[in-house]
């Protein structure tokens, strides 16, 4: 149970990073 939970957290964290990059890129234009 602990492993999938940490994996999900890591996965959501990477998604948040992708959104940050996407929005920063948009606002840069």
Curated annotation (Swiss-Prot):
Q: What is one GO cellular-component annotation here?
A: chloroplast
Q: From the Swiss-Prot or TrEMBL record, state where the protein is found.
A: Plastid, Chloroplast
Q: What is its main location?
A: plastid
Record's superkingdom?
A: Eukaryota
Q: What UniProt keywords apply to this chain's record, in alphabetical order?
A: Chloroplast, Plastid
Among its keywords, does the record have Chloroplast? yes
Its recorded name reads Uncharacterized 3.7 kDa protein in psbV-trnM intergenic region
Gene source species: Trieres chinensis (Marine centric diatom)
């Amino acid at each position: 149970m602990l492993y999938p939970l940490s994996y999900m957290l890591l996965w959501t964290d990477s998604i948040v990073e992708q959104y940050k990059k996407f929005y920063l890129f948009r606002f840069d234009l």
